[in-house]
Amino acid sequence: MNGTLDHPDQPDLDAIKMFVGQVPRTWSEKDLRELFEQYGAVYEINILRDRSQNPPQSKGCCFVTFYTRKAALEAQNALHNMKVLPGMHHPIQMKPADSEKNNAVEDRKLFIGMISKKCTENDIRVMFSSFGQIEECRILRGPDGLSRGCAFVTFTTRTMAQTAIKAMHQAQTMEGCSSPMVVKFADTQKDKEQKRMAQQLQQQMQQISAASVWGNLAGLNTLGPQYLALYLQLLQQTASSGNLNTLSSLHPMGGLNAMQLQNLAALAAAASAAQNTPSGTNALTTSSSPLSVLTSSGSSPSSSSSNSVNPIASLGALQTLAGATAGLNVGSLAGMAALNGGLGSSGLSNGTGSTMEALTQAYSGIQQYAAAALPTLYNQNLLTQQSIGAAGSQKEGPEGANLFIYHLPQEFGDQDLLQMFMPFGNVVSAKVFIDKQTNLSKCFGFVSYDNPVSAQAAIQSMNGFQIGMKRLKVQLKRSKNDSKPY
């Protein structure tokens, strides 16, 4: 369909095809044209119809293409979420069609670094014109008007931009430059925001480092709530983008290898999933959730609704990650998620079973479990009191509260076993079985709680937990009435 006489047959090259929703099903193309032409000449309108009906009926949405990009953007600013059409309950939804997103400017825009400061825009165009049609070329200049030695080049397609990167990146060293030319996709707004957040967090960490508290991630306890939320947000964005370099640039994470960073990203993604899960499903209750158990030692029942946030309480447990000097566990991420989203431990634990499985799977990817770190995570007095009677004891709890644990590390003793299972409830006994002839551990033991709920929480969190090259097997001890003890 052609435009009016004062317009060419085709829209401008940078025109945008817009998708428009929340349109009355009774409206015709004429009605829509009258609406849109208030903002500029319309090239084409295409109403989406249900072809299964006879005659085909409108689906209540359409595509519209203006002759100019400016008209499309003006229409979007005036209509999107602003105007409710007759007979509709919600405002118009107007945004670029998916086909336009696939050719977004950010997908075609290149950053060119390490160029000679003598180069002009025309020189850059000549240099890159062989790879395709250039939509825009701009050299970055300082307040004095002099080149900063870098530029932006936007091609009409992403394929052209990719070809230019392959051919030109580090292909030559220009006059006055100390290293080869850099050609890469320009940072998107999301990339810029992520870098800004990382810089803010790095500055805060450096201040803490000056006080020598950054020996490990236990220093997170001294961070204010806003920075804990920032930390989790950075982890979640990194997890979704797959860019682990941002994590490795942070001071306390510099010693982590790629696998450890991936585990961190997996934990962040899982924490994000738990945070976004509707709380009404109640697939796992607060009392049985590993998250609630791991965070319960540091928070009161009312802490999730309190306006004052205690960073230590919200973080919960922290322990070593795969033998590195810094690490996070599910409890700590749950605490940060609580700060970030206004959820307490109970809010996170009311997620679906699949969410908790994702958390457990991500958490079990951590290669080592440092039981020696646990005393610092929980109340030392409580640990001492329980250690007196529980370690080495074979006292049993009520039915359903007694656990059998396989695949313990050879070096684990009664105290280690107690420390590892204390976070899930009151332990009445913890015993590692020893070979009487060799005086070495048989690599299995028993743990008894004073209630079945704690035992189930321990099974959910610790069954399959990896220690070194083995995974723990945690299950209920058989009843006394059974012929076999386990």
Curated annotation (Swiss-Prot):
Pfam families: RRM_1. The modification Phosphoserine is found at residues 179, 302. GO terms for molecular function: BRE binding; lncRNA binding; mRNA 5'-UTR binding; mRNA binding; RNA binding; translation initiation factor binding. GO terms for biological process: cerebral cortex development; cerebral cortex neuron differentiation; mRNA splice site recognition; negative regulation of translation; positive regulation of multicellular organism growth; regulation of alternative mRNA splicing, via spliceosome; regulation of RNA splicing; spermatid development. Changing residue 302 to G: Reduces CDK4-mediated phosphorylation. Induction: Its RNA-binding activity on CEBPB mRNA increases in response to EGF. It is found in: Nucleus; Cytoplasm. Phosphorylated. Phosphorylated by CDK4 on Ser-302. Its phosphorylation status increases in aging liver and is important for the formation of the EIF2 complex and activation of CEBPB mRNA translation. Hyperphosphorylated in the EIF2 complex. EGFR signaling regulates its phosphorylation status in epithelial cells. There is a cross-link at residue 109 (Glycyl lysine isopeptide (Lys-Gly) (interchain with G-Cter in SUMO2)). Keywords: Acetylation, Activator, Cytoplasm, Isopeptide bond, mRNA processing, mRNA splicing, Nucleus, Phosphoprotein, Repeat, RNA-binding, Ubl conjugation. Residues 277-309 are annotated as: Disordered. Its main location: nucleus. One of its GO terms (cellular component) is nucleus. Expressed in skeletal muscle, uterus, diaphragm, lung, spleen, testis, mammary gland, adipose, eye and brain (at protein level). Strongly expressed in aging liver (at protein level). Expressed in lung, stomach, heart to very low levels (at protein level). Expressed in germ cells of the seminiferous tubules except in the central region that contains the elongated spermatids and spermatozoa (at protein level). Expressed in Leydig cells of the interstitial tissue (at protein level). RNA-binding protein implicated in the regulation of several post-transcriptional events. Involved in pre-mRNA alternative splicing, mRNA translation and stability. Mediates exon inclusion and/or exclusion in pre-mRNA that are subject to tissue-specific and developmentally regulated alternative splicing. Specifically activates exon 5 inclusion of cardiac isoforms of TNNT2 during heart remodeling at the juvenile to adult transition. RRM1 and RRM2 domains preferentially target UGU(U/G)-rich mRNA elements. Belongs to the CELF/BRUNOL family. Associates with polysomes. Interacts with HNRNPH1; the interaction in RNA-dependent. Interacts with PARN. Component of an EIF2 complex at least composed of CELF1/CUGBP1, CALR, CALR3, EIF2S1, EIF2S2, HSP90B1 and HSPA5. This is CUGBP Elav-like family member 1.
